[in-house]
A protein has these predicted regions:
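Binuclear metal-dependent hydrolase catalytic cores
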Residues: 42, 50
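Residue-level signal for well-ordered alpha-helical positions
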Residues: 16-17, 48, 89, 125
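Short, conserved active-site loop motifs that form the nucleotide-linked donor/cofactor pocket
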Residues: 33, 73, 124
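Short, well-structured N-terminal submotif of metal-dependent ribonuclease cores
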Residues: 1-37, 51-66, 108, 117, ...
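Phosphate/NTP-binding elements of NTP-utilizing enzymes
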Residues: 45
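Acidic, glycine-centered active-site loop in nucleotide-sugar glycosyltransferases
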Residues: 122-128
Length: 128
């Protein structure tokens, strides 16, 4: 199964944070699943790093590719269809990064691994 990680799920997985549910961890660790991280999440993390709200274990351009490879996590590019879908979404959520994740989930029919229950209002499949 293809699964799209919300940014917090990715970070909590990497840091072995107890906030990541046991079920979410199982989904991510299941080698039969194709785990994806949106390019939007990379942008979100980069902004948080530049604002001093996030620290990671090294330089962004070295740490992120290393962790993606180490954990067999693929990147989901942002397509025109994804950005067009954002324009049609109701405003259940104002966070632009989360709205892009919702659009990617809907367009690509890929469930989101996230603790954020507001995603449910969009009709996406959320796994936690």
């Amino acid at each position: 199964m293809r699964l799209l990680l919300d940014t917090h799920a990715f970070l909590w997985f990497l840091s072995d944070d107890a906030q990541l549910s046991d079920q979410a961890r199982k989904f991510i660790e299941d080698g039969a699943n194709e785990i994806l991280l949106s390019m939007a999440s990379l942008g979100e993390m980069a902004i948080k790093i530049s604002l001093g709200k996030l620290t990671i274990g090294g330089s962004f351009d070295a740490f992120i590719p290393e962790q993606l490879a180490l954990n067999s996590i693929g990147l989901l590019a942002i397509s025109l269809a994804h950005t067009a879908a954002i324009a049609t979404l109701p405003f259940h959520h104002r966070d632009p990064f989360d709205r892009l994740l919702v659009a990617q989930s809907l367009v690509d029919s890929v469930p989101i691994v996230s603790r954020d229950g507001v995603f449910d209002a969009y009709g996406v499949t959320r796994m936690w």
